[in-house]
């Protein structure tokens, strides 16, 4: 077993061997992505990935574009609606919105995340 453990285990830990192997020199941190805030939404984009993350906070109505979108309900509840149909998502639920325009409705105190390609 060629493992050098530094902690978080009941197995033998070799702190001095870990410190010998570890590179403790400072490095540049990646740039912090500042959100673009508009009303009840915060959009995180332009961070080197081909998608954007939109945080929807509290009671809001957010248009859903004709693109694939992952919807994650962290707290509260949300309703997705399009063409007269509705889908309800509660805390802990994840949904997938596929290439159709619609609307996301969230309730007071909700925290919902949308992840979609840019």
Question: What is each of the regions a protein language model found here?
Answer:
Residues 1-43:
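C-terminal, non-catalytic macromolecule-binding modules
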Residues 33-61, 67:
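A short glycine-rich, His/Asp/Glu-containing loop-to-beta-strand
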Residues 1-5, 86-90, 99-118:
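Ligand-binding loop in jelly-roll beta-barrel domains
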Residues 58-85, 90-94, 100:
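Glycine- and acidic-residue-biased ligand/ion/polar-headgroup-sensing regions
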Residues 33-35, 53-55, 70, 86, ...:
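Conserved hydrophobic/aromatic beta-strand scaffold that supports enzyme active sites
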Residues 46-49, 73, 108:
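A generic structural signal for short, non-catalytic loop/turn and secondary-structure boundary residues
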Residues 12, 57-59, 105:
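Histidine (H) residue identity feature
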């Amino acid at each position: 077993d060629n493992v050098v453990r530094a902690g978080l285990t009941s197995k033998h830990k070799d702190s001095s061997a870990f410190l010998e192997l570890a590179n403790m020199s400072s490095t540049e941190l990646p740039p912090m992505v500042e959100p673009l805030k508009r009303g009840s939404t915060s959009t995180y984009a332009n961070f080197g990935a081909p998608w954007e993350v939109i945080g929807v906070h509290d009671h809001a109505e957010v248009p859903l574009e004709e693109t694939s979108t992952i919807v994650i309900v962290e707290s509260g509840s949300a309703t997705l609606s399009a063409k007269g149909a509705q889908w309800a998502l509660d805390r802990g639920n994840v949904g997938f919105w596929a290439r159709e325009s619609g609307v996301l409705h969230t309730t007071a105190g909700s925290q919902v995340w949308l992840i979609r390609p840019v």
